C-alpha cells in the first residue's frame, strides 16, 4: 500500500467558469489558472501521482506548455491514472477536502463523486469529497480563492 497527499490552491479572477471536481458550479467568479483551475482534481491528481512515485501534476502537465492551456482537468486526471495503472496499482480510496468560503459545494459533491469514480474506474464508495470553510479566516475565508487537499491510497495488484 502507498499513500499520497495532494494540495492545490487557485485565486479567484479567471475568465472561465468555476469548475471543481469536474463540475461547473454557478458562481460570478472563475479561478486564475493555466488549465481549467480545478483545484479538487489537481489535488487528487497530485495525491495519486505521489502515491505512485510519479512526481506531480506540474511535472506531467507543465504550465509552461501551451498544449495544456485551458486543459480539462478530468482529461489530465485520466492520463495520470493511466500511467498509475501501468505501474500495477489500483485505488484503495481517495479522500478530498475542498476549502472555500463560497460558493457552497454541498449540492455539487454527489456529481463530483460520480465523475471521480468514472475517471478512476472505481466504485463511488472508493471516493469521498467533502467541503469546509475556514470560518472567514485567511485567503479562502476572505473569498480570495479556493484551496483543496487530497489523500490517496494505492494498492499494488
UniProtKB/Swiss-Prot annotation:
Is Lipoprotein set as a keyword in this record?
no
- In this chain, the site described as Transition state stabilizer is at 34, 133
**Chain residues that bind 4-CDP-2-C-methyl-D-erythritol 2-phosphate:** 8-10, 34-35, 56-58, 61-65, 100-106, 132-135, 139, 142
Cofactor(s) in the UniProt record = a divalent metal cation
GO molecular-function term, one example from the UniProt record:
2-C-methyl-D-erythritol 2,4-cyclodiphosphate synthase activity
Gene Ontology terms describing biological process: isopentenyl diphosphate biosynthetic process, methylerythritol 4-phosphate pathway; terpenoid biosynthetic process
- Read off the Pfam families from this record: YgbB (PF02542)
**UniProt: a divalent metal cation binding residues:** 8, 10, 42
Which InterPro entries did the record assign?
Answer: MECDP_synthase, MECDP_synthase_CS, MECDP_synthase_sf
State which pathway it belongs to. Answer: Isoprenoid biosynthesis; isopentenyl diphosphate biosynthesis via DXP pathway; isopentenyl diphosphate from 1-deoxy-D-xylulose 5-phosphate: step 4/6
Task: Provide the alphabetized UniProt keywords.
Answer: Isoprene biosynthesis, Lyase, Metal-binding
Say if the entry is tagged with keyword Ligase.
no
Q: List the disulfide bonds.
A: none
Give the co-factor note.
Answer: Binds 1 divalent metal cation per subunit.
Q: What is its EC number?
A: 4.6.1.12
Catalytic activity from the UniProt record: 4-CDP-2-C-methyl-D-erythritol 2-phosphate = 2-C-methyl-D-erythritol 2,4-cyclic diphosphate + CMP
How the protein assembles, per its UniProt entry?
Homotrimer.
Q: Which family does it belong to?
A: Belongs to the IspF family.
| Role summary | Involved in the biosynthesis of isopentenyl diphosphate (IPP) and dimethylallyl diphosphate (DMAPP), two major building blocks of isoprenoid compounds. Catalyzes the conversion of 4-diphosphocytidyl-2-C-methyl-D-erythritol 2-phosphate (CDP-ME2P) to 2-C-methyl-D-erythritol 2,4-cyclodiphosphate (ME-CPP) with a corresponding release of cytidine 5-monophosphate (CMP).
- The identity of this protein, by name, is 2-C-methyl-D-erythritol 2,4-cyclodiphosphate synthase
Organism of origin: Serratia proteamaculans (strain 568)
Q: Which gene encodes it?
A: ispF
